[in-house]
């Protein structure tokens, strides 16, 4: 296992280590002679590794879930049978009253195991503001997230995704300090269960890449990280932060990545985000984990939007493998 850019990497780096060890050992044995045919066979497992993996965020099906045309428990099977993916990112809104329902959580876990689908994280909303200026409300928000961390642990997730919201009317630094105080308490709780607490750019100052990266530096904990979203860079009103700059600033702390999509052209390219440019930023940061499809557009059906996003990501993956 190798650490690069603060991220543990197993694939390409470990193959390099294997290659170096092989060359060293064989050089010792045969006086430095090169045996490429032996090396090629020995290292065959190191080639054609995917640059990243693809998962599905439950929000991609939010309209179907809200209309009850599909049930939250069906999300896992759909991910595998309809979209051919093997990892999911849950949204707490779709099982909001089930965080402590052991029977329900066990059913989720059983279905994931039956379909060979990994549960990666739970996106947590509607649990108060972790940077609330009122200390009682801030502490309550921290405690509100405990049950989701416990559920994530049971489901074998690696993280909960939270929001670093404060009072938008407060100064930049004050919001940073308040968010850091609330998040630090939550991070310390989650750390006891080996669960990461990751923050998404999700409105307000969290959509300012410099602010959110500063928040990570202030918290300075290995269990605190980011979930860079390709599209969520609207701070307020019409104040947009540059998405490419923002993702680049957040990638050093990334423990997950959200490939937001809305609309595709006739060539299969996303209209709002240059996926090739964005994924280069992601890969250049040394990230090789899951990239989560999060389609939320209206131009295509949810199913079509997911398939289009998946097709584009797979195309980019093939070009970088």
Language-model regions, residue ranges each:
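Secretory targeting signals
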Residues: 1-17
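Histidine-acidic metal/acid-base catalytic patches
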Residues: 11, 18-37, 41-84, 206-321
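Active-site acidic/histidine proton-transfer and metal-coordination neighborhood
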Residues: 26-39, 77, 111-228, 235, ...
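Charged helix-capping and loop-helix junction motifs
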Residues: 70-74, 103-107, 138, 142-145, ...
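Short acidic/polar active-site loop segments enriched in Thr and Asp
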Residues: 86, 118, 158, 288-289
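Conserved beta-strand positions in the central sheet of alpha/beta enzyme cores
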Residues: 87-89, 121, 161, 258, ...
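Glycine-rich, proline-tolerant flexible connector loops at the mouths of alpha/beta enzymes
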Residues: 89-108, 167-170
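Short catalytic-loop micro-motif centered on adjacent basic/acidic residues
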Residues: 89-90, 197-201, 266
């Amino acid at each position: 296992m190798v650490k690069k850019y603060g991220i543990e990497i197993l694939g390409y780096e470990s193959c390099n280590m294997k290659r170096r060890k092989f060359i060293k050992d064989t050089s010792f044995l045969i006086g430095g002679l090169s045996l490429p045919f032996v090396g090629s066979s020995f290292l065959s497992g190191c080639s054609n590794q995917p640059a990243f993996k693809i998962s599905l965020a439950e929000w991609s099906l939010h309209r179907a879930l809200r209309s009850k045309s599909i049930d939250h428990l069906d999300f896992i099977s759909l991910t595998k049978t309809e979209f051919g993916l093997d990892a999911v990112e849950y949204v707490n809104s779709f099982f909001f009253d089930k965080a402590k329902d052991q029977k329900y959580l066990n059913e989720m876990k059983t279905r994931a195991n039956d379909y060979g689908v990994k549960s990666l994280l739970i996106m947590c909303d509607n649990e108060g503001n972790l940077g609330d200026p009122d200390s009682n409300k801030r502490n309550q928000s921290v405690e509100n997230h405990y049950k989701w961390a416990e559920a994530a642990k049971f489901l074998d997730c690696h993280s909960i995704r939270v929001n670093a919201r404060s009072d938008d009317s407060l100064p930049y630094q004050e919001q940073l300090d308040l968010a850091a105080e609330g998040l630090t308490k939550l991070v310390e709780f989650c750390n006891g269960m080996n669960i990461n607490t990751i923050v998404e750019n999700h409105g307000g100052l969290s959509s300012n890449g410099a602010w959110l990266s500063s928040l990570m530096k202030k918290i300075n904990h290995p269990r605190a990280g980011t979930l860079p979203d390709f599209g969520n860079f609207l701070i307020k009103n019409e104040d947009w932060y540059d998405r490419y700059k923002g993702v680049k600033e957040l990638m050093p702390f990334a423990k997950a990545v959200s490939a937001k999509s809305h609309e595709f052209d006739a060539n299969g390219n996303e209209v709002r985000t240059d996926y090739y440019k964005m994924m280069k930023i992601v890969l250049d940061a040394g990230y090789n984990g899951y990239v989560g499809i999060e389609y939320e557009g209206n131009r295509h059906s949810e199913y079509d939007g997911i398939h289009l996003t998946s097709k584009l990501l797979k195309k980019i993956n093939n070009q970088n493998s």
